[in-house]
Amino acid sequence: MLVKTFAAAVSGISATIITIEVSCTKGIQFFLVGLPDIAVRESHERIISALQVSGYKFPRSRIVINMAPADIRKEGSAYDLPLAIGVLAAAGDIDATLLDKYMLMGELSLDGNLQPIKGALPIAIKAREEGFKGFILPRKNAREAAVVDKLDVLGAENIKEVIDFFSGKGGLEPTIVNTREEFLAHQQHFDSDFSDVRGQENVKRALEVAAAGGHNMVMIGPPGSGKSMLAKRLPSILPPLSLLEALETTKIHSVAGKVGEQTSLLSQRPFRSPHHTISNVAMVGGGSFPQPGEVSLAHNGVLFLDELPEFNRSVLEVLRQPLEDRHINISRARFSVDYPAGFMLVASMNPCPCGFYNHPTRPCVCPPGSVQKYINRISGPLLDRIDIQIEITPVPFEKISEQRPSELSSVVRERVIKAREIQKKRYEAHKGIHCNAQMSSKDLHIYAIPDSEGLSLLKNAMQRLNLSARAYDRILKLSRTIADLDEAENIKSYHLAEAINYRNLDRESWGSA
């Protein structure tokens, strides 16, 4: 008897239908073809054990299983469930009538329980697109897949429940998730707030500008000055995710297996903070089983690199392409996958090896030339992609002990949202531009033209502060964002003056001591 079951293979953040054909005839051999990897081949032993524990026997027949299309490599253990159900149906142990209406995915334990899989959300989306009535998968993935409407998502605890379902004994109920309600319920909840931080008003303002214009940012300051504390509060002032952004972000985390059992849809912008020992592959993604890296897990959110110069030079260099293109393409001999990577880069660093260069009270003990050498660990092309470079100093005791309440993140967020709305309207006819940070040099001549007083100020600053040529475009982008926060149509001299203050590392005098 020949039967078909249906599964899926995930590539990038999309899925491809895999048709599993099972033929059961007289004989005693077992064949599995269609480019399966080792984990898929090993499913034979898992299926035998799971069926025995569940009260069924693996057929003593000649079984041939073909996984089509044969040119796509089938990887991982998530095919255990469709293979097992296909074998039972081909042997006549269960009714095959409903098999063409449901997609099946799940890894089997030896006791028959179903283990969670990766990529449940993109697979569910593909199942709906292909017209399947339902998707049967491990119960721990059910809420994640139930985000997809017009699809019955049936979460099963073990293979016995799935066998009973196809045998007409019931046992599986659709998982219902009110996507919009859950999305909105958790959107405004943050564990940390800008008001937690005493002082550092200039840095808070710089973070507000960064959030409003989507600008990358680096904070330079001594240990204990609050760099990490401030960076971790940045998501609390970013505009909320739209439903489409949340869906795309959740798909990436689903493929990486990072969506929790009780989570249906990520409702807050991700904040990723990898350790400085991270490898190239962990940063951008890849591996023998392609997985999204930190740049993709931070998509629509923030990638925070603490102690930037301590990262391996090659790791920092691989950031250049996703920062420019907002996606990352991973090409290997066997595959090529594409992951979204539209993130805000926020970094922190000490000003020198000892950490106390320009400190108001503690002397720097670094030898001559070491400060510039330390800064030079970050390449010019990478620094060129960081709009805001601000120095941060320790908070004096008077500020720390101050009882006056600081401004809440919710208040700052409202200003940021208004600025983003202005930019959305400005660039609605421009494909690929959503915020000021994405403007090209050509766009600057249209949307970021300072008045004559501002031009004079900018020229004077370039000469007196020895600002580099690459700072010019960045200053104009920042001044455009600052003007948007003021809800001003034209860029004024005071907008430019503030923007110039955010370009510390461009000054030739920096690190010359």
Predicted region positions:
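Peripheral, non-AAA+ core regions of ATP-driven protein-machinery
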Residues: M1-V218, S225, S331, A471-Y472, ...
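Residues immediately C-terminal
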Residues: L110, L303-F304, E310-F311
